[in-house]
Amino acid sequence: MVDSSKAPLPFRDSALSFKREYAESLDAQDPLREFRNQFIIPSKADLKRKSLAVAEGESPSSDCIYLCGNSLGLQPKNARMYIDRFLQTWATKAVLGHFTKLEDSPFPPYMDYDDVTSKLMAQVVGALPSEVAVMSTLTGNLHLLMASFYRPTKEKYKIILEGKAFPSDHYAVESQIRHHGFDPKDAMVLIEPKDLKEPVLPTERILKTIDEHASSTALILLPGIQYYSGQYLDIPTITAHAHSKGLLIGWDCAHAAGNVELKLHDWDVDFAAWCTYKYVNSGPGSMGALFVHEKHGQVNLENKEDPYRHRLTGWWGGDKSLRFLMDNNFVPRPGAAGFQLSNPSVLDMTAVLSSLDIFDKATMPALRKKSLELTAYLEHLLLNSPEGVRPSDDPFSIITPSDPEARGAQLSVLLKPGLLDSVFSHLVDNGVILDERKPDVIRVAPAPLYNTFTDVWDFVQIFFDACRKAAQEKDTTS
């Protein structure tokens, strides 16, 4: 049994915490409870139906239990209205929509959309508005940032990253190294976990790796939250240590943005990139965003030799007042905006804006507080439920750090070998949506904007039942 004394209140020491009524009481006290109503929760019938249209005579069904915000966030109810307003503007104003502020529209002219979204996004990641740009996609932004921050020499050419990085990050780093004429076998320094059963990377190991390779390293790229284990890395400590060795460091915040309370500016992070379709709830494949610390985004035209940091350039990154002069003399906008390339998709940014407006009202500190309580409650029920409720043979373990400050919303649950397919199928059949990572892991991520303590309680009961049935099936077939 796990010591639950370290779990946040209010379920620390009450036997009532294992009752559904207790979860309902927590929901009734939740100051963020109304935000769930701002999202569309698919029903169980929606998920099983093979068409968009509701079949004639179909009976209403309850909401599914959606614990997959770490993979794709749910649709804000205002997204349709926002997009309809954009389509109406495009239809009635055409090209004039770039410059016309409409009296009955909540949106800026197209020309200023990126400034509005960047200001709101900056609040989500703890940045100055000038340090954030909503643009492109995550891997595209990583390439753009590495084109600026990875400047290898014969002596300093290595990139330090985790050995189990998300594949797209690994590919991006590998291709950047090859692009500069180096061999990834030598130039990629991979920080490996002990194994997939113990995937957490101790901060000490990361710092030691930096020390060992500092003299030959050009860049460090790490995840804010590791996608598989759910570990929240110690960004300020690692960043400060990298800087003490004279190294630049960037962070992939795909699983951190909208999940934990980041302070990218205060932590002196050099650069970061993230997507917006997970916890930021902007739709499948939606736009990415990037952060460039203000110290790297300065523009000083009086310095003729080095007026601004080298980067790949495009016209949308140029000074707005000069953009339409078409004189082919690039003068970047200060800050992250100067890293933009092309006119961003206003349609896509409208979807991002529909979610950021909700974050603006909820605020990241309040969301993080609830998230800590939700995930601790999930952990508490999984590990401390009474005998007779919890499966007797302990068919799973949690590989995410037990320290609440070292994780976000996600708990990664490692099942005993051979159980995953059956457990996952049972969960889906009972209206639970989460994701799996072969061969044996399910990732459970209660999102504080729309998930409830009752969602967590219901999931745990269904999961326990799924584990028992999977074990029985395995015994029958073995």
Curated annotation (Swiss-Prot):
Keywords: Cytoplasm, Hydrolase, Pyridine nucleotide biosynthesis, Pyridoxal phosphate. One of its GO terms (biological process) is L-tryptophan catabolic process to kynurenine. Its cofactor is pyridoxal 5'-phosphate. Gene3D superfamilies: Aspartate Aminotransferase, domain 1 (3.90.1150.10), Type I PLP-dependent aspartate aminotransferase-like (Major domain) (3.40.640.10). Pyridoxal 5'-phosphate binds at residues 138-139, 166-169, 252, 255, 277, 315, 343. GO terms for cellular component: cytoplasm. It catalyses: L-kynurenine + H2O = anthranilate + L-alanine + H(+); 3-hydroxy-L-kynurenine + H2O = 3-hydroxyanthranilate + L-alanine + H(+). Pathway: Amino-acid degradation; L-kynurenine degradation; L-alanine and anthranilate from L-kynurenine: step 1/1; Cofactor biosynthesis; NAD(+) biosynthesis; quinolinate from L-kynurenine: step 2/3. The modification N6-(pyridoxal phosphate)lysine is found at residue 278. InterPro entries: Kynureninase, PyrdxlP-dep_Trfase, PyrdxlP-dep_Trfase_major, PyrdxlP-dep_Trfase_small. One of its GO terms (molecular function) is kynureninase activity. It is found in: Cytoplasm. Homodimer. Catalyzes the cleavage of L-kynurenine (L-Kyn) and L-3-hydroxykynurenine (L-3OHKyn) into anthranilic acid (AA) and 3-hydroxyanthranilic acid (3-OHAA), respectively. This is Kynureninase.
